[in-house]
Structure formats: structure tokens, C-alpha cells
Regions:
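Short alpha-helical interaction motifs and adjacent low-complexity tails used for partner binding
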Residues: 1-230
């Protein structure tokens, strides 16, 4: 069944402590992460893992750690636990985009994240694929609030035939935002005001929520990537 689950649902949006262990950890702990990963015993080690479902961790940036080799950030998840996120792209030219987009207070959304132990003993997430991560210009609290509004509006749109209200002044709406196709407005003036006041940030979040709403999180079919760095 397609549709975006509640972002507080830890089955699809786990906290760091619940993430599956990456291949490096599994050299220390031969553990099967049944909720996330299926293991094929007939294949060689490190080539025998495939996702059972889609999942994504949300991590708000609290500090930039200045490493000379790659971008590394101190982050917190929805439980408040802090850990590291390291960007390990093969294409190092993308690191300038990472530095430009990743700001303290913004939220990293990392698909298919796994727990990694770094050489210094710290734990975190190692992001190797550019399409695995999305940077949203909102805090975790703002992300949850926008998601709640989005999910409520999807249900309301299915149930109601009433004319939608302008997102700025609440008069009857005449057109939608061309970017997210979700926020509605009675006039160009109201749309311009709302963009400057709130929607510039919300629009990016709503577009991502809309993409996540289009597939079934319970069943892994194809890799669901994101386009910030691809």
C-alpha cells in the first residue's frame, strides 16, 4: 500500500540506535538485522545483503566537524541522541555542494542508513551514495509539523469536495503552487507574500513528502534515491 507513514513511526523512520549494522560492524558482530536486511547465505560475505523494506533516518545538524578529507557533521536524531554523519562520496567535487547545503539546524534525510563505526571508535552513518541523502532547510520539529499538515491534507482532499482555502489569507483558492502542487492561493499577491513568509522552506519539504507518499514503504522494490547531489 502506497502512502507516507507517520514520520514518528520507528519501523520506517528508525532512530540511530535501531539502525541495521553495516558490513564493517558485521565483521565484529555476526548479527542478522531481520527488520531491515535480508541475508542470502548462498552469496559471498558483504555481497549477500538486500533491503526488506524502505527506511530513512532523520538527523538534525548540530555542529560541523572540520575534517580535512571530507565533510563530517555532528547530528541528533528524533530521540535526541547525537552521532556523526560522514560524507564519503567517490566524487569529491560534490563536497562543495555538501558544505553549501548543510547548515546547523537543517535536517539530513538518509535513505537505507546503516550504523558505522569510524576508526576513532565513534559511531554514526557513512553516506557513500550521493542519491541516498536529502538536505531539508528545516529542523526536526519543523519537519514533523509540516509532515503532519501534509498527511492531514491528503486525507482531507480524499474526503472533501469543498473549495480549498488560500494558504495565506484563507479565502477561496484559485490556483496551486507550481512547484509542490499542494499549497493553494487566491491570487499571485498572496502567493508571493506566503513564499517570502513561510512557503519558500515548506515547499522543499512538501515536494519531498509528496515523493515519499508515492510508494509502498513496506515492500522494497527498487532503490528510492533523492536528487540533491546527483
Amino acid at each position: 500500500m502506497s502512502g507516507l507513514p507517520d514520520l514518528r513511526n520507528q519501523f520506517f523512520f528508525p532512530r540511530f540506535s535501531s539502525l541495521p549494522l553495516d558490513a564493517g560492524f558485521l565483521t565484529l558482530y555476526d548479527d542478522s538485522d531481520d527488520d531491515f536486511i535480508a541475508f542470502d547465505k548462498s552469496k559471498p560475505r558483504f555481497q549477500n545483503r538486500s533491503p526488506r523494506k524502505h527506511w530513512c533516518i532523520f538527523a538534525e545538524i548540530v555542529q560541523e566537524n572540520r575534517w580535512p578529507i571530507r565533510p563530517v557533521y555532528q547530528v541528533k536524531d528524533l530521540s535526541g541522541r547525537q552521532s556523526l554523519v560522514s560524507f564519503n562520496f567517490d566524487d569529491r567535487s560534490l563536497f562543495a555542494d555538501v558544505a553549501r547545503k548543510c547548515k546547523v539546524g537543517y535536517t539530513l534525510c538518509i535513505m537505507y542508513a546503516e550504523r558505522h563505526q569510524f576508526a576513532d571508535g565513534n559511531e554514526g552513518v557513512r553516506v557513500e551514495q550521493p542519491d541516498a541523502v536529502k538536505v531539508l532547510p528545516v529542523s526536526l520539529r519543523e519537519l514533523l509539523a509540516t509532515s503532519d499538515v501534509f498527511r492531514a491534507s491528503i486525507k482531507a482532499n480524499h474526503a472533501s469536495t469543498d473549495t480549498a482555502a488560500c494558504s495565506n489569507c484563507y479565502k477561496p483558492a484559485a490556483h496551486r503552487c507550481s512547484r509542490c502542487s499542494l499549497s493553494e492561493y487566491c491570487s499571485k499577491e498572496c502567493q508571493t507574500q506566503h513564499w517570502a513568509k513561510k512557503h519558500k522552506k515548506d515547499c522543499q519539504v512538501l515536494r519531498q513528502l509528496k515523493l515519499w507518499n508515492a510508494f509502498d514503504w513496506h515492500r522494497y522494490d527498487v532503490r528510492r534515491g533523492m536528487n540533491d547531489f546527483v
